Every structure is written in structure tokens, then in C-alpha cells.
Amino acid sequence: MSVKKSPEELKKIFEKYAAKEGDPDQLSKEELKLLIQNELPALLKGSSSIDDLFKELDKNGDGEVSFEEFQVLVKKISQ
């Protein structure tokens, strides 16, 4: 996934993975892992683990990542 996608395209990618289990508007840790493995594999080559990344993105501590929280990752990797 290129981060140069439109907001609508990013939302569709997010929703595709969020719909796999539980709340279709939130990514679980497993859904985030699948999204990164399939769409952003270069992130896994860095020093960040999925657990660390998930903790960083889950700003409200509810155990899931909302689209707004996911956008933090998109902004981070597009810089």
C-alpha cells in the first residue's frame, strides 16, 4: 500500500481489514498485523514490533485501533 493513496482509498483498506473480526470500525491487534504484513511489509523490517506499534497507535487504550488512530501511522510513514 502506498501512503500516497487518497483518504477514501485508505479508508477502504482499513475497513477491509477491520471487518475480518469484531468491530468493523476498529482494528484488533491481529487485524493490524495482517494489514501491515500485506500492505506495509517494510514496517516489519524496522525496529518496531507489532506490539509496540499497536500500543503507540491505541491512544485511548481500548485495545483496538480506530481509523483516526490508524491515520497517525499513515502520517508517520508518509513523512
From Swiss-Prot:
EF-hand domain segment(s): 13-48, 45-79
Pfam families membership: EF-hand_1, S_100
Record keyword Metal-binding present: yes
Residues carrying Phosphoserine: S47
GO cellular component terms attached to this protein's record: apical plasma membrane; basolateral plasma membrane; cytoplasm
Residues annotated as binding Ca(2+) 2: D58, N60, D62, E64, E69
Annotated signal sequence range: none
Key words, A-Z: Acetylation, Calcium, Metal-binding, Phosphoprotein, Repeat, Vitamin D
Family annotation (InterPro entries): EF-hand-dom_pair (IPR011992), EF_Hand_1_Ca_BS (IPR018247), EF_hand_dom (IPR002048), S-100_dom (IPR034325), S100/CaBP7/8-like_CS (IPR001751), S100_Ca-bd_sub (IPR013787)
Calcium among keywords: yes
Single GO molecular function: vitamin D binding
Positions that bind Ca(2+) 1: Q26, E31
Residue list for modification N-acetylserine: S2
PROSITE patterns assigned: EF_HAND_1, EF_HAND_2, S100_CABP
Name of the protein this chain belongs to: Protein S100-G
Species the sequence originates in: Equus caballus (Horse)
Gene that specifies this protein: S100G
